[in-house]
Amino acid sequence: MPMWVMLVSKGGDMGIGSEEKPGCDSASAAPQHVLMLPGLDGSGSLSTPFLSALQAHGLTTQAITLPAQGGQDHATLAQRLWSQLPGHPFILLAESFSGPLAVELATRHPTGLRGLVLASTFARRPVPLPAASAALLSPAWPLPPVALLARLLLGRWRTREHMSMLRDALVQIPAITLRQRAAATLRVDVRALLSAIEVPTLCLHACHDRLLWPPSVAELQALLPDARHVSLEGPHLLLQARADAAAAEVAAWMRTLSP
């Protein structure tokens, strides 16, 4: 399989897309707000069903759109997104590409951060390729067909609706930006930062993830021994294919947290 096909399938101007639903009041025993960092596409448009499922549990939700211009490495993105983190209590949730980005942000100890959720993600390159391979992600390479991406990302859980959402998400972002982010996944390594995470952490793993190299998943589990690790039946795009189940896990875990 071409390297670009392996990488791009992991998964505008800076902005925030949000969906709100009234939750519990400030006297609640646990945080009620979830701030989401989306996957490789960076738009958050693929996450609408999952955010709606969280809202059904009485939570408020917000998805940050990753900036499409400028450096796309995780450290640079973390610096640019820092000012968008709220001062009130919140849970930071990140999937796939944004996992290392969330780690970068969490270890800077935001005032309102009360917990971290990492879904279908990694601490360093998620495929068995050397970091130097990032230079081979030529801008001239074409994007893989949506049908192929859907098979890799969603497997037997793919539907026409999923394929339509995936197609719409990909056309919103410049191809060069997708390639830059894919290259960043080969260079990133936040393993040394994991021990600096000071908030409760939940890790959601997909049992049928065709994108993440199994050793990278095992490594994350080993380096976060105090986190709650939950494996769900589903593909790499776990939050899209199993939105209700994933939201239920997140909501139940959040109820165990201190204010």
Locations of the language-model features?
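Flexible "cap/lid" loop of the alpha/beta hydrolase fold
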Residues: 107, 112-143
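Short beta-strand/loop motif that positions the catalytic acidic residue
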Residues: 197, 203-205
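Catalytic histidine-centered segment of alpha/beta-hydrolase-like enzymes
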Residues: 234-247
